Amino acid sequence: MSLRFVIGRAGSGKSTLCLHEVQEELKQRPRGETILYLVPEQMTFQTQQALIGSEDVRGSIRAQVFSFSRLAWKVLQEVGGASRLHIDEAGVHMLLRKIVESRKDGLSVFQKAAEQNGFFEHLGSMIAEFKRYNVTPSNVYEMWQQLDAHSSSAEQKLLANKVYDLQLLYDDFERALIGKYLDSEDYLQLLVEKLPQSEYVKGAEIYIDGFHSFSPQELEIVRQLMICGARVTITLTIDEKTLAQPVNELDLFYETTLTYEKIKQVAREEKIEIEKTIPLMEQPRFHSPALAHLEAHYEARPNEKFNGEASVTIHTAANLRAEVEGVAREIRRLVADENYRYRDIAVLLRNGESYYDVMRTLFTDYNIPHFIDEKRPMSHHPLVECIRSALEIISGNWRYDAVFRCVKTELLYPLDVRKETMREEMDEFENYCLAYGVQGKRWTSEDPWMYRRYRSLDDTDGMITDSEREMEEKINRLRGVVRTPVIRMQKRLKRAGTVMQMCEAVYLFLEELDVPKKLEALRIRAEESGDFLFATDHEQVWEEVMSLLDTFVEMLGEEKMSLSMFTDVMSTGLEALQFANIPPSLDQVLIANIDRSRLSNVKATFVIGVNEGVIPAAPMDEGMLSDEERDVLSAAGIELAPTTRQTLLEEQFVMYQMVTRATEKLYISCPLADEEGKTLLASSFIKKIKRMFPDVKDTFITNDVNDLSRSEQISYVATPEVTLSYVMQQLQTWKRYGFEGNLDFWWDVYNFYVTSDEWKQKSSRVLSSLFYRNRAQKLSTAVSRDLYGDKIKGSVSRMELFNRCAYAHFAQHGLSLRERDIFKLDAPDIGELFHAALKRIADRLLRENRTWADLSIKECEHLSAVVIEEIAPLLQRQILLSSNRHFYLKQKLQQIIFRTSIILREHAKSSGFVPVDLEVPFGMGGTGSLPPMEFSLPNGVKMEVVGRIDRVDKAEDENGTFLRIIDYKSSSKALDLTEVYYGLALQMLTYLDVVTSNAHTWMKKGGTASPAGVLYFHIHNPIVEVKGDASEAEIEKEILKKFKMKGLVLGDADVVRLMDNKLSTGSSDIISAGLKKDGSFSARSSIASEQEFNVLQKYVHHTFENIGKDITEGVIDIAPYKKGNKAACTFCNFKSVCQFDESLEDNQFRTLKDMKDSEAMEKIREEVGGE
């Protein structure tokens, strides 16, 4: 029994010496004693290859490469002890979840923390750490007693409570495992116990290579190996000079020196012979003088400079994507020009979550075979999501999001269905569920679902159309596709008495959905498309899910568990599932994490993402215990993993390892911005490298090739997939600026695409965008007639929409596009309710031959409640009756109608105008409808403007009859003559024209009527500010002012007084007008003469004719208006359709100039030739 150390700096040949010794031994004595070669887990594959890579050694039974965990399996299979069931990380998390849930009421700190994402991952890591450092539950309990007895400050009490919780959970976890299960850490403890019984290890020649430190648990394994083996050889990266000096924590080799001393101490304790240490002084790894200099002088202060050409390259990239593309281009150059193999190259990084997706995409585009040494979570796989969401459906009462997350996995679809068709149908089905607010009992009820197209509050005929019946049948068929398998599992879960039966319900759910066959189909499809990584994913995920169910049953099978806990435990297990890495092929670029990688035999290393806070790493407190808490435990005798401070001290060694992997070339790079454009800073480590290699230039990498020389641009020509984007970039620059530059070279590349049989069609789709103009071509007469018909019948709102944006009109009225209907109460729904409520009250008053003025306050309250109760079941599929929140909203809406009724009562008392009709249709056909506003367009098309007028008021005096329009609005609005001029506000003047043209309808003896004005009535329940001693009358007066109607009224003092008979001088509280003492109107009055009203009405006719002409002639320009801070696009539903983009030459707003009313009126006169 002896111990031998082989030490040396990085690249000195320690591993090579050991491998050569093993290979020589195998040649000399192929059937001798066992040779064990122990390495970290991530080194096993490459070490096995290196061991049998010699021409003289093609295989061996005598020598085996192991990690500690694999050695544990080997020994336990030999001597026994492996009969207990192994539980993996997912099983550990599930067991911990169950323990925490059952212990929740007794936990002090973790009761609420258990609900946070990542809690069980941290808890599992903490328990694993306890085990690695030989800390037992009783040790933790003793620590709690000690802390609890001496806790005085809040921080000390918090730590004591935290340790108490950890002790409870750790003890429960260990009790659950005893005699039944083994987790990964238990195998190592068993290995310690069983090694003395192993004949396989007894007398073996043992090599331990690639480690820098050992946990106490691993150190115990090393102890037993030294006792059992013939000789143990351990390699450590240490400079021999370091061993001759006192240990200093700032020394580069501090960590490995401590390891060296610990192992020697163990050897002394066990009286193991310590052979003479073998120091290696040469640097055989480095073929480059610059890299040899970097290794030899890495820790030197001040930095030793290397003068001359260096094989070290530094790049700064514009952004992360540019950095990765730069790496890809250089890898292709090394392979093409310098005869590198892909396996000779490695990419090292730390923040993989920012890089991996980009690297997968770009390396694939550049045709670079690669292997990412990182396990991927299974959480996003359709199978995992299907199980998780299906359980959420059941435990969460069939919420919309859970249901359609499950649907979108496509595993609920019948096996033989055409997926494209089913996707379209499910999209329609989802729209139905959103529109009808389907969730909860609606899913579980046996009653069939109904489908009715929502029309209006007045549509109560109840007749179902053929298309509605057909849609109803489809909806119920699709409901069955979703509902049937989940309901079946729900019933089984509710009947289940044990966890085993619950797991069986999940398994049967998957089997009855034919999930294995569906996954096999996905695997075949992935293989056919050449995506072999995803093909293996579909195989792995089924095996892992089945293993998870087996583990669940093995651990907790006979226990009873609530559905919610079962769902939580299962979700925790599913979250922990990971795809196993497929071993790399013989020729791939290795992409690995700096902290975990153990590379060898690479010629070139790319270290990317070297940004401040990443390399070196910024201090971060992660996990269950903070650094301060770890220090307290350490002082009390419990050794745990290094603190952040210790980790930062080790960071220099990590970076040293990172830059000494390559034999020929080192590339270091950092991006100046991340994928979202956020600024990043270069690491101070780059400055250190620059000081060591002052002749190395920092090269800037960009995605924009325009600023590069011709020779530099040539390097951007890689694969056809990648190069196409750069061709586009160059030609776009040429098109926009006419810049020639290196365009002759890019034209050659362009010619390749347009002449290549393989790329002609693919590239044409991309290159066509070069000449893309986001312009909507005018519709032909034939198409226009097909879309709109030979007779146009449209509302005033439709005409206004055309003037806001012709393309939006085309999308809505030509293509009939609309947003999906969602079960929610929007402003239009509330507006419709207000209109209907006031109409019902007014209709009742007309039937009773009463006016608003006749109502009492109590009647206003009663009537508002009655009409809201009548309307609520008719509005938006009974949305106001669907929940407590909406019921509360119904009460608030009733209060608004009540307040509005009081104001209308006050208005009626003060006005000579009385309502004579409500919701007056024109051009709608049927009894009571006024005729439409008709136009014969120059191209022969007939156009009718139709609509419905909220309220018509009439007043009479000795000067004649006057009619005015009142329009109810749920928001404040005024009549802007500028918007009238631009055709954006035509509604009120159109209504006034219609009623005055048909005045005989409301006049007993026939005759004509004059326009009195148009006014907006704002329906709301305002809050007013008054003095503390204000009377109720004063408060009511202030509220009345908030209801002042805005609009445009006839500039006749007598007519204005008819609208407000309390007005003598000053401003009216009812309308936006006021009188001076001399009887003239105040400056702020919104008035127009009768002649001006006539001009406005003529202008409205003129505008409609122009709109009709443009519609029928196919005008669909993408030309939205913009006036001040208002724009047509602000609330437009069709932005994703027109793709309006101001950066495009053809896409510009029609900027409308704001004008005073007098200016606008003058322009209107000019248009119609009015006086």
Curated annotation (Swiss-Prot):
Its EC number is 3.1.-.-. ATP binds at residues 8-15. [4Fe-4S] cluster binds at residues 805, 1129, 1132, 1138. Its cofactor is Mg(2+); [4Fe-4S] cluster. PROSITE patterns: UVRD_HELICASE_ATP_BIND, UVRD_HELICASE_CTER. Keywords: 4Fe-4S, ATP-binding, DNA damage, DNA repair, DNA-binding, Exonuclease, Helicase, Hydrolase, Iron, Iron-sulfur, Metal-binding, Nuclease, Nucleotide-binding. It comes from the Bacteria. Transmembrane segments: none annotated. Disulfide bonds: none annotated. Residues 1-343 form the UvrD-like helicase ATP-binding domain. One of its GO terms (molecular function) is 5'-3' exonuclease activity. The keyword DNA-binding applies. The keyword DNA-binding applies. InterPro entries: ADDB_N, DNA_helicase_suAddB, DNA_helicase_UvrD-like_C, P-loop_NTPase, PDDEXK-like_dom_sf, PDDEXK_AddAB-type. One of its GO terms (biological process) is double-strand break repair via homologous recombination. Gene3D superfamilies: 3.90.320.10, 6.10.140.1030, P-loop containing nucleotide triphosphate hydrolases (3.40.50.300). Belongs to the helicase family. AddB/RexB type 1 subfamily. Despite having conserved helicase domains, this subunit does not have helicase activity. Heterodimer of AddA and AddB. The heterodimer acts as both an ATP-dependent DNA helicase and an ATP-dependent, dual-direction single-stranded exonuclease. Recognizes the chi site generating a DNA molecule suitable for the initiation of homologous recombination. The AddB subunit has 5' -> 3' nuclease activity but not helicase activity. This is ATP-dependent helicase/deoxyribonuclease subunit B. It comes from Bacillus cereus (strain AH187).
